[in-house]
Amino acid sequence: GKILGIFPEGGITSTILTEAKPGAVFIASKANTKILPVSISGGEYAWDNMLKGNSSIITINIGKSFGPLEIKGSKEEKMNKLESYSRELMCRIAALLPDNKHGDFTGDKTIKKYRKEDGFRFFK
C-alpha cells in the first residue's frame, strides 16, 4: 500500500528520453502492482536557474497506469519480457512529453496510441 518512485533510465538527468534499465519493471512485476507513467520536464535547468536567483517552470504529466505485469518463462523469455515492458514504459512516458523530448523513442508508433489513451495533446 505504499508508493515508490523510480526513474527507469537509472536516475540520470537528460533533456531527452533514453533506454530504461529493467529494474522498475522487475520490481513492479515482483510486487504484482501497476506502474504509473509520469513525465517531468524543465527540471534539467532548475539548479542552474536557482543558483542565478531565477525560477524554473517544471511540468509534471501523469499517464494512465498499466499492469500488473506477468514475467514468466525461461531466462531468455523473462529477459525479453523485461525489455519489452521497459520499452512500453518509456513509450508511455514519451506520450506525456512533447515530440522533441522522445530521444531514443522518436518515431515509435505506440507513442501516438498511448497519447490518445491518456488524452494528451501538445501544441507547437
Residue ranges: model-predicted function:
Residues 1-124:
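Non-catalytic C-terminal accessory region of glycerolipid acyltransferases
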